[in-house]
């Protein structure tokens, strides 16, 4: 009778394992468990030191994370404190400035109160002369006049005052007063330096105010306008001097350039004249040398006897008389020599005629040699 075998799923490799034990981990491999069912098969292989190290490392990692979180919190707190410190510093600066201003005001108020309690003197006030013409005062204080009209009136007054001041100054410079003339005509040892200083220094303008009174605003404005005009005149004179100086410098430069050009032309003309004189002397010298050389050659030819170039005998020698030669005498050879030029003495002279060419021109060379010997 055929019976089906028992399936393997009901049989385990470790027969004594209880899968319903609560001490075992879920989904654990039965191979990792020992035969008694304790479930620590692989853990026995790992030593205890490694386990302790891993636990310490995990603990240190957790502590590191906690410390990093604490550091982040501290950094945020520091940033908030920095912002607070900056705002407090700005407020401190602001309040210190306000405190200084208040102290200055208090000092000014104290000084003003102390001055009012003291004695009042004339030097504490500006003294102005009284106006004599009420019409001008009425015109100035007239509310119907506009601002432009007031400005025009003031400008007219200033022009009139400047004209009067300039006229008075010119008149004082042109004609000194009679008292000064008399003192200048009769100088004394005590009054001589005073007269010299008074004649050199201009007289002050005659003002209607007394010595102890202070100058008015109009006088001050007139004095300032006069000083400005004097400064303008000085500036214009300095400008004219500068222009004249620049023109003189430019003229000097142009004249120096013309002088250099003329000197260059003169030197070139002198060089040309010297070259022409040297060329004329060079052309006149060669005829003298050409005439002198033939005279020397004639003297040599007259003093030296005539020899035959083939037999080397004179014409009167008996051996020479037996031969019929086309004689080329030494004097003829000397006459054929080229003269040394005087202008260019280092030129290459033409070579003399060779003996072979001379023999070929006179006849057969072998025949002449046989005849000689």
From Swiss-Prot:
InterPro entries: Spc42 (IPR021611). Residues 104-151, 169-216, 278-299 are annotated as: Disordered. Its main location: nucleus. Residues 54-89, 222-275 form a coiled coil. Residues 134-151 have a biased composition (Basic and acidic residues). GO terms for cellular component: cytoplasm; nucleus; spindle pole body. It is found in: Nucleus; Cytoplasm, Cytoskeleton, Microtubule organizing center, Spindle pole body. Residues 187-210 have a biased composition (Low complexity). It comes from the Eukaryota. Keywords: Coiled coil, Cytoplasm, Cytoskeleton, Nucleus. Belongs to the SPC42 family. Forms a polymeric layer at the periphery of the spindle pole body (SPB) central plaque which has an essential function during SPB duplication and may facilitate attachment of the SPB to the nuclear membrane. This is Spindle pole body component SPC42. The lineage of its organism: Eukaryota, Fungi, Dikarya, Ascomycota, Saccharomycotina.
